[in-house]
């Protein structure tokens, strides 16, 4: 399996740690960076390349939807797989995220299997994983 790189964006450190542990267990050798909000993620995405972004919706400074919208406006990030990992699972929020160009949606709380399935699907679709 080729090495993949993921940016995990969430203001809750325990969620970032949970996501990173889950991904490291399933994808040995994965490169993971993290950010505490959309603004920090924006700075990281401006200087580094990733295969996938996993992002919370509700965060201080810049929310996940704002980060997603910004990514879709950048030529080099327009097709970057972007999965929302959020407690905002109601229909209006899901539709809003889809309209903004989200690649996938994982509702909190989630199981490791749910997260890994969404990540694998997004990476396969983008041609970043060997099937």
Segments the model singles out, each with a brief description of its role:
Residues 13-33:
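Two-component/phosphorelay signaling modules centered on CheY-like receiver
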Residues 34-43, 64:
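Helix N-cap/capping motif at the beta->alpha junctions
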Residues 43, 65-78:
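Short amphipathic alpha-helix used as the core "switch/output" element in two-component signaling
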Residues 48-54:
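Active-site beta3 strand of CheY-like receiver
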Residues 59:
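Receiver (REC) domain active-site loop signature in two-component systems and cognate sites
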Residues 110-119:
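C-terminal output helix
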């Amino acid at each position: 399996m080729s090495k993949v790189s993921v940016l995990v964006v969430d203001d809750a450190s325990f969620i970032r740690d949970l996501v990173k542990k889950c991904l490291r267990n399933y994808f040995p050798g994965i490169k993971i960076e993290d950010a505490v909000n959309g603004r920090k993620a924006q700075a990281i995405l401006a200087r580094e390349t990733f295969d996938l972004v996993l992002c919370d919706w509700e965060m201080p400074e810049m929310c996940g939807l704002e980060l997603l919208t910004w990514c879709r406006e950048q030529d080099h990030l327009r097709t970057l797989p972007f999965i929302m990992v959020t407690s905002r699972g109601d229909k209006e929020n899901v539709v809003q995220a889809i309209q903004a160009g989200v690649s996938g949606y994982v509702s909190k709380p989630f199981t490791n299997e749910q997260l890994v399935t969404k990540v694998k699907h997004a990476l396969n679709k983008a041609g970043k994983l060997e099937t």
